[in-house]
């Protein structure tokens, strides 16, 4: 769908013209509802799989096999168990992942990816997960052995540096394995975006365009990386379908995440949440092992066969904490919208960009309470369009909330 084929209702012309919230198409409503069903299925499977590995004793048998192959060497046993666990998880989830990521996307006209390409990306993702798990899983089990009373605290605190490491490595070494990144193809638009980024103190080398049109018809943009690897990435589908002023607002929004240091907030929040989850595991593990240890096939938490127990309890805690984590995410997105509006001062372009996101991504403008509690990482598009229509303090002579974060 080309940008000029969309009909966007406005009440006036110019940068302050208001844009009406469009009604969702029947296809978008169907896509939204089917997404809710898939989310519920994936969430249930996330909890059922580790429970099954525990209560069938399969986890203990896998550890026994790994231990035999590793000749009872602890680190090698943990690495082999990690490989087996990731492969079991990947294969169990494969039918659901295939349907959600390939079949469903093609059924709704959102994907252009071939089956071979999808399976190739899936295999690469599994291989990378296997590698990281085999290299890192020994850390919590080593801490469990040397500090059985405080292992949960040390492991939780290690979440921060490990997350930073992944964020540094991801855009430079991992993401290019899946997609082609480069400078923007439109020199005029690139210069326009570079000027905007320069006002916020972001070097022009941090703006990338990624070739996604071979995989999808959806549009997106995001901030990735940490420190020297931090960058703003625009999908080529977004650049092709949005007007230049709409792209400029989208970049302004991503600049908001960049200069407001939302990545640091995410790292701190993730560290606290992981630490809380591990503390709860620490508190309940003794009782669970005492009651079900014979069925589980292990009698100590520092046995790597306990990994499904950590995954089960940790997953339940993460699910319970989702409403709070998603509320924080929605606040960050709103503030990024605010900074994007302040730095571009083009309300109309912002509202039009949200309309195009709604139509190209088969989104619904208003979701509902349950969605917002358990899935809503962004404000409803209707709220974002209405906010874009009305937020213009510069016209009323009021100070900008983030006026000190960028040059005029």
Language model feature labels by segment:
Residues 4-301, 311, 315-408:
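Polar-ligand-bearing catalytic/cofactor-coordination segments
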